[in-house]
C-alpha cells in the first residue's frame, strides 16, 4: 500500500477550486481521501468517489481507507475495481462532470493513457487535475502537450506531481 502523497497540495487544490464533486484513484490507507473529504466539508459539502483495485492475496482489505473518520464517510463512495471499470463508474456517479481529480494508481504509461483523457473530459471548467509520480514515464508531459494544457510540476518526498486546471 502506497504513501500519503502531498496532502497539503491536495487539500488546497480542492479548497481553492471550490470543488463539490471529486474523483481519485489509488486509496491505500486513505490519506488523500481524508484530505479531499476534509476540503469538501470546508467547501460546504460534496462527494468523493474513490477507485482502488482490490488485492485479495495481500489481505489488506481492512486497511483500505482506514484513516478516513466515520464523520466524513457519508460523502465517500469507495469503488473496489481496477481503473478501467472503476474510473468510469466514479465519473458516472457525478453524471459525467467533476471538479477535482487525483490520479495515484496505475503508474504504467498505458494505464495513464487510458485514464487521463477520461478524467480531462469529465473535468468541469475551473476544475483541477493532479497526477502523482509523473516521473515514472512521459505520459503526463505528452498529455498536456497534446491538449495544449497549462501545467505545473512540484515535488513531494522525491516524487514529481503534475497539476493542471481546466480553463
Report each predicted region and the residues it spans.
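S-adenosylmethionine/decaboxylated-SAM
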Residues: 4-167
Amino acid at each position: 500500500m502506497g504513501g500519503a502523497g502531498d496532502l497539503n497540495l491536495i487539500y488546497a487544490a480542492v479548497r481553492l477550486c471550490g470543488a463539490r464533486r471529486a474523483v481519485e484513484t489509488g486509496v491505500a490507507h486513505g490519506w488523500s481521501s481524508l484530505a479531499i473529504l476534509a476540503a469538501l466539508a470546508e467547501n460546504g459539502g460534496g462527494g468523493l468517489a474513490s477507485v482502488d483495485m482490490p488485492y485479495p492475496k495481500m489481505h489488506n482489505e481492512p486497511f483500505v481507507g482506514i484513516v478516513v473518520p466515520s464523520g466524513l464517510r457519508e460523502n465517500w463512495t469507495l469503488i473496489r475495481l481496477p481503473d478501467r471499470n472503476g474510473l468510469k463508474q466514479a465519473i458516472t456517479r457525478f453524471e459525467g462532470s467533476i471538479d477535482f481529480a487525483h490520479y495515484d494508481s496505475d503508474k504504467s504509461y498505458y494505464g495513464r493513457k487510458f485514464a487521463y483523457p477520461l478524467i480531462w473530459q469529465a473535468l468541469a471548467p475551473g476544475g483541477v487535475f493532479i497526477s502523482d509520480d509523473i516521473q515514472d514515464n512521459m505520459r503526463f508531459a505528452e498529455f498536456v502537450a497534446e491538449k495544449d494544457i497549462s501545467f505545473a510540476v512540484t515535488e513531494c518526498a522525491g516524487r514529481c506531481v503534475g497539476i493542471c486546471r481546466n480553463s
